[in-house]
């Protein structure tokens, strides 16, 4: 069931921080393309990317807002997910020194799934909006 798979991946990896689930859900040589020109290959690099986001926002909670897919078990599936997340900028990481500001972000992720594994991921979210929320005027 595609819906259950997608919800389980997001909940287990992003919300429960169970990074060992990456190896279960993703092909070992998964190809990733993301915001700000990020491109990498492999589950180790994917794990590093996820941990880098969570290092900046350790209380990040992600939810799926919309989910669409097409395909079949034989040929694989193409999945599109619109998600939202809320977290507090409490940790050092890609977004500088902690500001303790709450940040809302949303993004779109597309997956190509073959043989019950994610083989390609495209994820886009507005990193400028994150920086504006972190560095914006203090009221």
Question: Where is each model-derived feature located?
Answer:
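C-terminal and inter-domain tail/linker signature
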Residues: 1-139
